[in-house]
């Protein structure tokens, strides 16, 4: 915080992947106390578990999975009290980039709908996003798509994804 406060930037952008979206939402919630909220201009969330994921719901039941997944596994559940739902929704311009397979079933056949292997698109949507785009990619693979990079750059510059 001290370095950022010393630099006092005019504008800050967040680009997150997966749980990084929950970290950004938590940070955004604490910014008013530091007088920074007006400086957060845009947020791009790539494959965010904004409402949690059924995959975490399944694994959080296992003691071994909780041990391997670490203390943050419960934060990724769909539990409205303790899970991803409990993080505040930012009012900054937000764009979502979501991975899908592009069919009725996604990469994880145990999930009911199209998905990136971990996240179902409806569980990523906040409701106040300015724009969203779907890319055929897995949860980790989406980071290595040149299309993802182009989308991030375009949204940070314009607040929209290219083909909107």
Language-model regions, residue ranges each:
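Serine-dependent carboxylesterase/thioesterase catalytic core
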Residues: 1-91
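C-terminal catalytic-base region of ester-bond hydrolases, centering on the histidine
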Residues: 89-164
């Amino acid at each position: 915080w001290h370095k950022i406060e010393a630099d006092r930037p005019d504008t800050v952008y967040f680009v997150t992947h997966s749980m990084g979206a929950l970290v950004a939402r938590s940070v955004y919630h604490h910014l008013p106390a530091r007088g920074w909220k007006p400086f957060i201009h845009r947020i791009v969330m790539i494959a965010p578990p904004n409402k949690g994921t059924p995959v975490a719901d399944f694994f959080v039941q296992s003691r071994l999975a909780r041990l391997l997944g670490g203390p943050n596994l419960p934060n990724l559940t769909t539990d409205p009290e303790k899970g991803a739902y409990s993080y505040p929704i930012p009012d900054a311009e937000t764009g979502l980039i979501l991975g899908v397979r592009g069919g009725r079933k996604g990469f994880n056949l145990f999930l009911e709908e199209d998905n990136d292997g971990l996240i179902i698109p409806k569980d990523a949507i906040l409701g106040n996003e300015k724009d969203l785009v779907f890319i055929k990619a897995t949860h980790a693979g989406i980071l290595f798509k040149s299309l993802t990079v182009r989308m991030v750059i375009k949204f940070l510059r314009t607040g929209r994804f290219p083909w909107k």
